[in-house]
From Swiss-Prot:
The keyword Repeat applies. GO terms for cellular component: cytoplasm; cytoskeleton; endomembrane system; plasma membrane. Coiled coil: none annotated. Interacts with RHOQ and CDC42, in a GTP-dependent manner. It is a peripheral membrane protein. This is Cdc42 effector protein 1.
Length: 388
């Protein structure tokens, strides 16, 4: 006799073939993880434990704390374990106090993320193996002292690898500076301290701290400094011009009213035969006879004085009195210099000999008056330009 389902022809479904996940109640219809979905620990970080947002905790969570998680039995009480963990997370900045239970083998961990410990202790995650790994790889100055105020401490006691904070690094640097300044005092202090006294502040050595690395990079002198050095060297000769070797300073300088340019003196032409009759005085000044202008001799060490009517004006291009009515040409300037300044013979050496002070015995007396050429000027209609 066919069953009630045989008449409809629908295939029969056995309840034994259904997955147990389908019978798990869910408020939102989502699949929740169960203990049988988690494989046993295989030594891999990804399959060791699981903590869900909804409070699902599976696997070995003994590395988090010895007070809550237990290997193999953690999934039995996920709610109580998660509640304790959430309470520790909410109290950020306040380290959890030690529990008075005698079964506690180690203090509660500090309020830091346990993932740091997981990343360091891969692939072993149990507490005993981690402690041995930390002892073998990291060397501490001394064993941590037991906390007397009921708070947990860092370092080897809590099973967490901590890095020196900034105040500790500053304390190290200050100690090093004090040691460099006064090595004898620090040595006496170390000898006076008892070797059996534990260090109240356990911390890693400077070589093990990540903050102790220093990178000194020397790039050498900059390009700007080299350019400034070259510019300073090029400006130094310009600032201090060398003294002219071929232009000695005369002992007797003519006054400012007279022309003292030696280059102009060297280009002076010798008096020609067509010029008026002239005579030569012992001091080398050539006097031309003709319309004369009186020049008074000055004391020793000064040049001949020119009358005020023949003095240069501000522009120095002509004589003040005569320039108003006549043009002043280059030939007039040469004739003027030929009458006032001594003639140059030979080279610069001969000029130096003439200007240098001769001995007192061989020095000729200077006449009281010297007649110079009364300068001849061109007509007023001459179109030559005045050369300054």
């Amino acid at each position: 006799m066919p069953g009630p389902q045989g008449g409809t022809g629908a295939p029969s479904m056995s309840l034994g073939k259904l997955s147990p996940v389908g019978w798990v109640p869910s408020s939102h219809g989502k699949r929740r993880l169960t203990a049988d979905m988690i494989s046993p620990p295989l030594g891999d970080f990804r399959h060791t434990m699981h903590v869900g947002r909804g409070g699902d905790v599976f696997g070995d969570t003994s590395f988090l704390s010895n007070h809550g998680g237990r290997s193999g039995n953690t999934h039995r009480s996920p709610r109580s374990f998660l509640a304790r963990k959430l309470q520790q997370v909410r109290r950020v900045g306040v380290p959890p106090r030690r529990m008075a239970s005698p079964a506690a083998t180690s203090p509660a961990p500090p309020p830091i993320s346990p993932i740091i410990k997981n990343a360091i202790s891969l692939p072993q995650l149990n507490q005993a193996t981690y402690d041995s790994l930390v002892v073998s790889k990291l060397s501490f100055d001394s064993t941590p002292a037991s906390s007397t105020d009921g708070r947990s401490g860092y370092g080897l006691e809590s099973g967490f690898c901590t890095i020196s904070r900034l105040p500790r690094v500053e304390k190290h640097s200050s100690r090093d500076r004090d040691h460099d300044r006064d090595p004898d005092h620090s040595q006496d202090r170390e000898q006076s301290s008892s070797p059996s006294e534990p260090n109240p502040n356990p911390e890693l050595r400077r070589s093990d701290s990540l903050l102790s690395f220093r990178f000194d990079l020397d790039l050498g002198p900059s390009l700007l400094s080299e350019l400034l050095g070259v510019m300073s060297l090029s400006e130094a000769p310009a600032a201090n011009p060398p003294a002219p070797a071929a232009n000695p300073a005369p002992t007797a300088k003519p006054p400012a009213d007279a022309v003292t340019t030696l280059d102009t003196v060297t280009s002076l032409p010798a008096p020609t035969a067509s010029s008026p009759s002239s005579g030569r005085f012992p001091n080398g000044v050539t006097a031309v006879l003709g319309p004369v202008a009186e020049v008074k001799a000055s004391p020793v060490g000064e040049g001949p004085q020119v009358p005020s009517k023949m003095a240069f004006d501000r522009r120095g291009a002509s004589w003040g009195a005569i320039r108003a009515s006549r043009h002043y040409t280059e030939m007039d300037a040469r004739r003027e210099l030929a009458g006032v300044l001594p003639q140059v013979h030979g080279s610069w050496e001969s000029l130096n000999e003439e200007w240098s002070a001769p001995p007192a015995s061989s020095r000729a007396p200077v006449p009281s008056t010297v007649q110079a050429n009364a300068f001849e000027f061109a007509d007023a209609d001459e179109d030559d330009e005045v050369k300054v």
